[in-house]
Amino acid sequence: YDHLQGIPFFGPGYVPMNKIVFHGCHEELPDALHKQMQPPYFPVTFDEMKAEISFEIHKPGDMVEVAGYKVLTVEQDHPGLSYGYRFERDGKSIVYSTDAEHRAHHHRKEYPFLDFIRDADLLIFDAPYSFNEAGGAKEDWGHSSNITGVDFASRAQVKHITIFHHDPAGSDKNLSRFLRETRNFLHRRKNTNLPVKNAEPGEGPFGLDERFPEEISLSYDGLIIEV
């Protein structure tokens, strides 16, 4: 329910003459939206939204054209499944990857998710946990770590990674420290000179490219990033 609770308050859905298309990969998406908007959960039913609403359900790996953007989809590891989206237009690309758990054995060069995010200008990455938390007490919770995000961004040559889906219990002070530790990890790794066999120029240990990511940021309400 926490994934959908903003929909009943989506103002454009109540405006007559608006046309709204919900895109997703969950086959049960229409049923889920209807069920959450009924008493006793919510006083207004989904059918009372005045806009003209339709659904388009896609399969993982599909590529569709939406509002001038090429949109690609990928299935992700999360309880109940989740899906990541890659948006491409005018030579720029943004990947939105929420509610995804990338495990320790995924830190290998042939991991398919790396191809999905490769060369992205911006990767919006779900990472509420430290590396130790993600592989320990919070394993199987469906989320990833800051270190994993930086590792993937480096190996896939992503220019900018912004971390989001913060721990609800985290304070502003904790989040600032989390960002600082993430940037420190990148700085230390870039300044660690380790011999690498058969490495291409700019490529570090285990497929890491020391040139990427160029920037790390932390998401917040109202954040605007130009790509």
What are these regions (language model features)?
Residues 1-95, 103, 114-115, 173-227:
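Binuclear metal-dependent hydrolase catalytic cores
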Residues 99:
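Conserved acidic
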Residues 104-208, 212-214:
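Cap/insert and terminal regions of metallo-dependent hydrolase folds
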